[in-house]
Amino acid sequence: MGGGDKVKILKAIFAAASAVCYLNSAILPESDWSKKDLKGEVKSMTATEYEYSIDGSGALENTRVKRTEFNENGYIVQETEHINGAPNSSVLFEYGKDGLIRKKYQDSAVYLYEYEFDGENLVATAKEQHVEDKFYPRMEKITYGKDGKMIARTVYSGGTLVTDDSYVYDEKGVLTRIENNMEPRHGIEISFERKPNGEYEKITQAPNSKWVYYYAANGDEMEYTSVNYFGSEAKIWQILQFKDISRDERGNLTRKTSVKFKPADKYYENGDIIKIGLYKKMEIKYEYYAK
């Protein structure tokens, strides 16, 4: 091989490496700040949730404390949850210099991440490590579009495909449909109904269920209703109304209380409702990165 050929090969290698670096910098998954609709550069958030008896007696049953820590790019580096003071779950992420997750420790499992490009999309593959039984290692593959939003997700358990979903967004980047590619009939449709005063409803519709979220013009959640369908009958499963909502100076939620109701007629979706009692209280504290 002549010297000129070697130079050409080296140039090709450097060009390929530069292209990969460029794509890495151009495509990053949507930040967790964005997913959680957080305002400002949140360093950590600690959410304390008080869960009360479902009978409406007001008796406190559980206290959940979830602490989430973010890096300066808005991605979660660690999240832990305690229930009544006892550890319940934990996840820890390690990132590379390119800003992408390289390793995840989730409870007792460890995942290593690899990345490739499918056209203009970024594909992340997380493989579970140190699994003795070859039939149970888990592998998850997520595809991100140019805007960083997840557009496809597949999950394998021991080599068997168990999840195959596609995510569809409108022109504003709002999720409108989750397609179940394994069971097309089980897809989820998401729609919005907006009122002239700025209030709106978010309706999530599955084949046998519906979840309706009611929001004030400022984005505060006012009410939530879940409905299950049995043939032609619609049975209300749960109704929650929210009060005592407050936000900090950046606009992030700091307090919310939910009260549970039930319909006077369990098969009548828009009828009168009866108050059961206190359901949950949420308090959230934030730390921010210094500007």
Roles of regions detected by a PLM:
Residues 15-22:
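Bacterial N-terminal signal peptides
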Residues 1-6:
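Short, Lys/Arg-enriched N-terminal segments with co-localized hydrophobic residues
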Residues 8-15:
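Sec-dependent signal peptide recognition
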Residues 25-291:
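Buried hydrophobic residues that stabilize the cores of well-folded domains
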